[in-house]
Amino acid sequence: KTKKIDGVELTGWFTEDFTLSELNQLKARERIPPLRPNNVQYNDQFSIPTLEQIIELAEKNYKKTGKMVGLYIETKHPTYFQQQNLSLEDPLLKTLAKYSYTRDIAPIYLQSFEVTNLKYFKDQLTLHKTLKRAKIIQLYDEKSMRPADFVAQNVNITYADMATAQGLKNVATYANGVGPWKPYIFNDTYTAPSDFIKNAHAVNLKVHPYTFRPENNFLAPNLKCNGLAENATQRCETGANKEFEMYFKAGVDGIFTDDPALGRKAVDAYLKANSTTM
């Protein structure tokens, strides 16, 4: 079948076509194997967990070790799922409120590239106060694009508009932080950061840019280990660490990375060298 999701026509099978028991039969695979060929060795080894299973795993680990692991949850295509009568927001909040771990203990971040559902989260969290540590994060896509809900509502506001000082001030009325695409902070020359972080911090928004990856293909030209096209998939930890450090120095409050082990090392090294916290 063919469906239009956020303005893009897609042909295939969709999650709403299956039951949970059917989805449980699927195995996870590397999303972009041409760019991360080493990861295909893990294909078909792991089932796709439900949110409840992830919470229960984190809670079990917390009770055993005392180590707290937060949950950073993105609501994917909320306008589309609302149109399918499969709204995500209330089931998500109900699931999080079900467990003492997510209700009272762990830090929770709720993020979306759309705006309307984040405002709904804000209203519900303010009204019910069931999730004591929940925060709301506005994600930013490419600058010329508009949030899918704005497109559906004929609202002519782009992500670039939302990234101005006034735009960030507006976002701060419903969100606790922002998750910008990396180029909002540095362009490919990596000469100096933009005013994005400064303007976000001025209205008390945390800044968590995405996505940090150590393969050459995802690094700026001056950070690659080898600039030859055939080395696009080469892992380049030195370049990735330089990139981490530049964003840390620019003042980010957190990062999204596909290599959490490398990211953790980079954070620890930066904090040790600068005797500070993030």
Give, region by region, the residue ranges found by the protein language model.
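C-terminal active-site rim and adjoining tail of enzyme catalytic domains
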Residues: 81-82, 124, 128-278
